[in-house]
């Protein structure tokens, strides 16, 4: 930790966080704890900080690293990293994260584990098709069976968790009522995109990583490209679009066909359809939330 020019180290557990809180309480002005998103480690920290009522902000690691390079800092050590995080948060006037409920935070943790097992199972299935050794084939099949059971257990736990929260259950049921949205996508929208319905079309496309960015220089006009964003949501939107393309009269199908007739590459047409589906979902959710609050 870097605070007022001094470095300190705390364990990422309850005892370590108690010492951190004691230090923060001794300060004469409010303290905002800034940290980088590092997967499950940062989620543990977020839950601990939330339980102690400490203001926090989770930062994008690539933005912090780019800031360090911009000011000429090439070295990367724990001490230098925490200093760069603190300076970046100060220079950009970082605002505290909107407090998430413990239910949502646990749902995110379960979704992260679910994505891990799905990726591992997909990799195992891919390697199985190219495997010739009988022993390894049996071992891979056993691993796939294990992952399938783990996925089923985690999904069951996620459904149980959603049922404990009326707002989440209502949102889940609403998403399922929309064409092209299945149980997996509905779960992911709740856990990985809770902001849906609270942003405009540009904001939601940028957040998910489906907003096209210019790549121009002088007289050169480069191809527009999408980057970053929430990969889990993008993958599920891709599957949703693939499902909707089977419906010949659906607006997504018509848009895809128009783009292909114009000579657009398949991936370009798919991303455009994913963006259209996301913007539609955002607009429909915004309308549903408005009607729900008005009622």
Each PLM stretch: what is its role?
Residues 34-45, 225:
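Acidic, metal-coordinating catalytic cores used for nucleic-acid/nucleotide bond scission
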Residues 95-108, 132, 221-224, 254-271:
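Short, solvent-exposed helix-loop connector elements
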């Amino acid at each position: 930790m870097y605070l007022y020019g001094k470095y300190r180290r705390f364990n990422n557990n309850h005892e370590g966080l108690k010492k951190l809180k004691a230090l923060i309480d001794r300060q004469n002005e409010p303290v905002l704890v800034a940290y980088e998103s590092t997967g499950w480690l940062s989620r543990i920290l977020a839950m601990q900080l939330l339980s102690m009522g400490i203001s926090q902000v989770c930062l994008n690691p690539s933005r912090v690293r780019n800031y360090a390079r911009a000011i000429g800092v090439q070295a990367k050590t724990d001490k230098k990293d925490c200093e760069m995080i603190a300076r970046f948060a100060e220079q950009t006037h970082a605002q505290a994260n909107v407090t998430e409920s413990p239910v949502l935070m646990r749902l995110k943790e379960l979704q992260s584990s679910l994505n891990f097992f799905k990726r591992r199972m997909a990799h195992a299935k891919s390697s199985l098709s190219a495997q010739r050794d009988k022993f390894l084939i049996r071992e891979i099949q056993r691993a796939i069976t294990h992952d399938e059971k783990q996925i089923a257990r985690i999904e069951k736990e996620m459904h149980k968790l959603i049922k404990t929260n009326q707002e989440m259950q209502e949102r889940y049921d609403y998403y399922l009522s929309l064409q092209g949205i299945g149980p997996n996508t509905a779960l992911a929208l709740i856990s990985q995109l809770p902001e849906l319905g609270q942003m405009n079309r540009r904001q939601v496309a940028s957040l998910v990583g489906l907003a096209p960015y210019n790549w121009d220089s002088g007289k050169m006009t480069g191809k527009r490209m999408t980057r970053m964003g929430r990969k889990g949501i993008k993958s599920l939107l891709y599957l949703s679009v693939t499902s909707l393309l089977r419906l010949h009269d659906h607006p997504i199908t018509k848009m895809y066909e128009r783009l292909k007739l114009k000579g657009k590459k398949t991936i370009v047409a798919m991303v455009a359809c994913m963006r259209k589906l996301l913007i539609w979902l955002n607009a429909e959710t915004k309308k549903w939330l408005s009607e729900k609050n008005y009622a």
